Structure formats: C-alpha cells, structure tokens
Amino acid sequence: MESIFHEKQEGSLCAQHCLNNLLQGEYFSPVELSSIAHQLDEEERLRMAEGGVTSEDYRTFLQQPSGNMDDSGFFSIQVISNALKVWGLELILFNSPEYQRLRIDPINERSFICNYKEHWFTVRKLGKQWFNLNSLLTGPELISDTYLALFLAQLQQEGYSIFVVKGDLPDCEADQLLQMIKVQQMHRPKLIGEELAHLKEQSALKADLERVLEAADGPGMFDDDEDDLQRALAMSRQEIDMEDEEADLRRAIQLSMQGSSRGMCEDSPQTSSTDLSSEELRKRREAYFEKQQHQQQEADRPGYLSYPCERPTTSSGGLRSNQAGNAMSEEDVLRATVTVSLETAKDSLKAERKK
C-alpha cells in the first residue's frame, strides 16, 4: 500500500487529485490545469465570435463566467479530457450505447474516472488488483474483482457519471510491485472528515479521562465529599431535634390548657388572654414574681403570723372570687407565655429550613 501514490483532498482540487492518482505521480498542478481551461475558454470565444462580435449571444457569452473552471479549483470534464490527451489517453462514457455494445467486462479495463456534481476520483487497476483512489479517503481502498461491477453499478445508481480511460498509462512503481505480490487490507480507509471527527472525539475523551484521573488523585476530592455528607447529616439532625422540641412544646401547651380549663370551670368563666401584647405579658409576669417574692419575705420575718383574722374582713364569696381571679390571671399568663414561645420556635424553624 505504501508504494501507491494517493493525493488527499485539498480545497476543491479534486480534478487535479483525480488525474495525479490515475497517472500515479505529480503530473499536473492547478496552474497547468488553469492554463488548459483558459485555452478552452478562448476556443469557445472564437467560435462564438464567428456569429458576429456585436451579436447578443456573443455579448452574453462574454458576461458569463468560465464553464471550464472556477475560483474554488473545480475543472470541467473538457479540462480533464484535454489533460489526458497529452499522455495519449481518451475518455469514453461507461454507460454510453457505443461502449455497452462492446460488452467489455469491467475487470478487463485498466481504469475509470468517476464524477458526481463537482467531485472527481479515480478507480484504477494496479498489478492484478483494483483500488479506489478517491481523494476524500484517508488511503487507497482495495476492491475485489467480484465487487468491482457491483461498485460501479452502485455509483451509477447514486448519480455518478463513469468514464473508461482508454490507452496506455505511464509505468509506475506500484504497478510493477503489485504484479508480483498481492496486498491484503485488514481495515478499510475512512472518509477524511469522518477520520478527523473520530480523532477529535478520541482527543476529547482522552482529555476528559485525564481530568477525571487528576481529580481522583487530588487530596481534596474525597475530603470535600465527606464534608458535604457531614453537613447534610448535621442539618438533618437539627431538623429532627427542632421537630421533637415542637412536639414537646405542643404537649406542654395541651396540658396547660387542660389544667386551666378545669380551674376556670370550677371558679369562673374562662377569659381569653391570647390577645395580650408582649409588653403586657412581661408586666404581668414581673408583677406576679414580685408578689411571690414579697410574700416570701413577709413569711420569713420574725413574729409573722398568718391567721385569717389578720386579713381584711370579707365575705366567703368575695374571698373565693378574689382567689379565682388571681388563679385565672396566673394561668392566663402561663398560657400566653407558652403560646409566644411556640410562635417564636416556629419562626426560627422556618428560617432555618430556608437556609
């Protein structure tokens, strides 16, 4: 395979690659093919001028671009045909009635030139084997004798024009070498664009793998994962503790409410204190604790006797009413205090969960 000359695609110079792959050497350059195209353009201009240089057809012809070449590097079949005439070679359309009447088996030919739209490539026999020398491939593609006819038929189905190259091709090293040996191809060549895409994909995968390995070898990778896990566990435990505290607080509220309800039913109707402000609750708590402290100090004084006769004389009904009022006030203070504590705990829990 190394001895086979194979030019790969550059720009749109497929006609040049086709000719050089056919002749197995750097026989033509873009400049030489452009010169042939200009000669053809001049010959066409002279033929059009025969009808008169002032005619409408002639002026229209001059305004049109060349049909034999363009700026991209494309060359017409006329350019390729004239270039081959230099070497005594001739092109015949493969599916023309004239050639089909000859009933020649394709494997008995020496080479073909295939064209689809603006792309040209060569299929040539080197030694005793056929090769697809398409410049869009990464290398020559081996074609068996049995597959050659199917390959050409497939190209025709795809819209290709196929030309048979008639004449004696120049001698080349690959043809002489392959007359003595046969080559085997384990892997078929890929299209150049496909190969580039495959190489880019492999390069990207390799780069990703290297980044993963570098990250895995780094000391901070697993430490970061462990820190994240510990933070998640701590937040989970904190939420559970807050839920437990909320449940305990609700049970305390319920018990307090039950005790307050029983005391109220025995003495007087229940009065609501949930509408009290925080400042009023604070003042009531201070008054309650000052009263308790004052009573304790009085009880600790020497000679202090706690007899009912020393208290102001009131009726038994008035005494019960006063005691019930004091009891209600204390119970209301306790219940309101617990309610405020519960609301504060709920607000703290919501703020923590938002974080």
UniProtKB/Swiss-Prot annotation:
Gene3D superfamilies: 3.90.70.40, S15/NS1, RNA-binding. It catalyses: Thiol-dependent hydrolysis of ester, thioester, amide, peptide and isopeptide bonds formed by the C-terminal Gly of ubiquitin (a 76-residue protein attached to proteins as an intracellular targeting signal). The keyword Cell inner membrane does not apply. The keyword RNA-binding does not apply. GO terms for biological process: actin cytoskeleton organization; cellular response to amino acid starvation; cellular response to heat; cellular response to misfolded protein; exploration behavior; intermediate filament cytoskeleton organization; microtubule cytoskeleton organization; monoubiquitinated protein deubiquitination. There is a cross-link at residue 1 (Peptide (Met-Gly) (interchain with G-Cter in ubiquitin)). Ubiquitously expressed. Residues 279-301 have a biased composition (Basic and acidic residues). InterPro entries: Ataxin-3, Josephin, UIM_dom. It is a peripheral membrane protein. Residues 257-333 are annotated as: Disordered. Its main location: nucleus. Changing residue 14 to A/S: Loss of enzyme activity. Residues 224-243, 244-263, 329-348 form the UIM domain. There is a cross-link at residue 200 (Glycyl lysine isopeptide (Lys-Gly) (interchain with G-Cter in ubiquitin)). Keywords: Hydrolase, Isopeptide bond, Lysosome, Membrane, Nucleus, Phosphoprotein, Protease, Repeat, Thiol protease, Transcription, Transcription regulation, Ubl conjugation, Ubl conjugation pathway. The active site is at 14 (nucleophile), 119 (proton acceptor), 134. The modification Phosphoserine is found at residues 268, 272-273, 321. GO terms for molecular function: ATPase binding; cysteine-type deubiquitinase activity; histone deacetylase binding; identical protein binding; K48-linked deubiquitinase activity; K63-linked deubiquitinase activity; RNA polymerase II transcription regulatory region sequence-specific DNA binding; transcription corepressor binding. The UIM domains bind ubiquitin and interact with various E3 ubiquitin-protein ligase, such as STUB1/CHIP. They are essential to limit the length of ubiquitin chains. Deubiquitinating enzyme involved in protein homeostasis maintenance, transcription, cytoskeleton regulation, myogenesis and degradation of misfolded chaperone substrates. Binds long polyubiquitin chains and trims them, while it has weak or no activity against chains of 4 or less ubiquitins. Involved in degradation of misfolded chaperone substrates via its interaction with STUB1/CHIP: recruited to monoubiquitinated STUB1/CHIP, and restricts the length of ubiquitin chain attached to STUB1/CHIP substrates and preventing further chain extension. PANTHER family: ATAXIN-3-RELATED. This is Ataxin-3. It comes from Rattus norvegicus. The gene is Atxn3.
